[in-house]
Amino acid sequence: MSTEGKEIKKQEEEYSASNIQVLEGLEAVRKRPAMYIGDIGEKGLHHLVYEVVDNSIDEALAGHCTDIDVTINEDNSITVKDNGRGIPTDFHEKEGKSALEVVLTVLHAGGKFDKGSYKVSGGLHGVGVSCVNALSTLLIAEIHRDGKIFRQSYSKGAPTSPVEVIGTCDDRGTTITFKPDGSIFTLTTEYKYDILANRLRELAFLNKGIHLNLLDKRQRDENGEYVGDHFYSEEGLKEFVEYLDATRGQAITESIIYIDTEKNGVPVEVAMQYNDSFSENVHSYVNNINTIEGGTHLTGFRRALTRTLKKYAEDSGMLAKLKFDINGDDFREGLTAVVSVKVAEPQFEGQTKTKLGNDEVSAAVDQAMSTALSHYLEENPRDAKAIVQKVILAATARHAARHAREMVQRKTVLSGAGLPGKLADCSSRDRSIAEIFFVEGDSAGGTAKQGRDRNFQAIMPLRGKILNIEKAQEHRMWENEEIKNMFTALGVTIGTEEDSKALNLEKLRYDKIIIMTDAYVDVSHIATLMLTFFFRKMKELIENGHVYIATPPLFLVKKGQQERYCWTEKERDEITAEMGKGVHVQRYKGLGEMNSHQLWETTMNPDTRILRKVTIDNAAEADRVFSMLMGDEVPPRREFIEKHAHYANIDA
């Protein structure tokens, strides 16, 4: 290499205070935390961890880090340790203090804004570790760099000690320990292991070759060891698709179609496989962010998939006898795919700022997909034939489903008063206050009708068993009486101007859709069937925050005239101990065991009830869990139930 070449390489790889760029100050974070981390509930609490982990992932993407350790400490503080270069600690000329202090106290300060340090960087809000610092009562940064160990502590964003050298070392890396501020995270400061595990697993698939470790010092396994997991993927998205497909139907192609290339300066990675299920399972990412609302990368993927497969199908003569057109939806039925792109300056838009807007990315993904998929189809004629046959089946089923759906939707529109007979509607026509309870069984439905506030609460009893959407073709759905009644009661239809499969919410009649089933486990199966239906066919209701689960109490604790309701066994034990001797405990096995006044007070009264909002924080994981719980494969379902049995209210 020439002297000039060496100098350029040296400049690129040097990472010091001069690389740290500052965009704005920290003052506003504690005043308006939701603006910076999304919310101040459970989601925002876990987002703090992601912000710190994203810094380490950026180091890994730049080729400087291979191991990231996340520890939940006994006091619910978090420690994130990596073996990257270590945050610079030298003096920052412009800011007049240590670069470490700049990174930890100035919002949007960091190497990710200096293109010589990082080509791309992850993280949706991208506010960095300074935001975590502002929202923590304690933050300790320990840097191993240049043979020394540097340490500095903070509280609520302000330093409580200078940058100190506390020892020597022969390794390198950054360790951040922080404790979230309970005065800001008032709902909870307790971290959920599964939420962090799901995100770290996802990051391992999206960034092959990185070791991610999770350790929970709050709980031990049967051997007395701390509970923990190690996430590592050698093949990245290929293994991600295998993981997602493990609980779905039988694969119809022999191998996973995999693309890893760069087009127009945009790295594009895609893995996809077809199976014999009936739902589309496509997940897209930009710089490790799950783009729930899609965007230009997904548009490019879908366009190339449809065009390339359609051309192959037409050229092979397999569509000759088909009497109706096939469309893009048909090419995606039974498809599991992950699309991941890295974009230097992503533009996010949409309701949740998770929709990619960069136009150049669409063309890059389209080109990458078209080229690779054409080669694959030519080289694997057996797989190509199986895919086209699947597409023809999907088109035939869609045609039948459209006819059945139109019959249902036309009947509702023409008959005018086409509401189901068993719906006890509310008197208010103000959608913003109206709510509907879907109640299992006639007896509970009767009690709910008596207990409700007729002004704004509607009751819809569900008599028969709801169809398991996971195993059924769409035309079967439109033949199911309970599902037809649910569509009619809600007032929604399928099909918008932009998307024939999207849910049209214009005529939605209720703001809150509440699933109300008995508290014991057999009946929660009905709730799961309903959630599967909403997730697969009415996902927009969940995404727009309309779906809730009612939480009836499990116990009534009585002593004389005193009555207390309990929602958990822990609560029951505490109240029983508090009341002393002579306590009578009643366990509710069903909603029908409560009278209408009790049901109103505990489960339906907006002032006293507990409603659980259904959200999709991790779409890929939600997809996998629904496929597992409602699909045909028994072993993974049994394993999942055994692992999560302690969360269930099992009546033994």
Give the ranges of each region predicted by the language model:
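C-terminal interaction appendages of subunits in large macromolecular complexes
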Residues: 396-415, 430-436, 446, 450-452, ...
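GHKL-family ATPase ATP-binding module
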Residues: 1-19, 26, 50, 58-60, ...
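Short adenine-binding "F-helix/F-box" segment of the Bergerat
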Residues: 92-93, 100
